[in-house]
């Protein structure tokens, strides 16, 4: 999911499986609910025999502090496990005002680009 999105990560997973290699999710979403939700979806949709243990699910969320983008988490991590959110998208609701406030650079793409 950190390789350009979930679709790119799934491509890498297919390559790893063909090569007989393990995947290291490499994430530590101890702060970001959105990142942890993406990780949960990726790990749940990837065969377990391909995955190394994931940092997100070892340390849990909220270790660093509350997440301003998703202050009311829809899922939790306990003892290294979680249920994948089943709401639309990644299953978490983002606070739009916080997203605007935390955006560093915005690019607008139109049909003609």
For the regions a language model picked out, list residue spans one by one.
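Shared catalytic-loop signature of beta/alpha-barrel
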Residues: 1-81, 85
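Extended hydrophobic packing segments that form well-structured cores
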Residues: 89-113
């Amino acid at each position: 999911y950190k390789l350009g999105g979930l679709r790119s990560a799934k491509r890498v997973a297919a390559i790893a499986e063909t090569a007989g290699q393990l995947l290291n999710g490499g994430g530590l979403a101890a702060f970001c609910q959105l990142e942890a939700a993406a990780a949960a979806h990726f790990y749940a949709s990837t065969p377990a025999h391909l995955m190394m243990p994931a940092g997100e699910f070892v340390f849990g969320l909220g270790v660093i502090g509350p997440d301003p983008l998703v202050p009311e988490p829809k899922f939790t991590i306990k003892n290294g496990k979680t249920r994948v959110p089943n709401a639309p998208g990644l299953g978490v609701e983002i606070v739009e005002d916080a997203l605007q406030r935390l955006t560093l650079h915005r690019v607008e793409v139109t049909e003609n680009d």
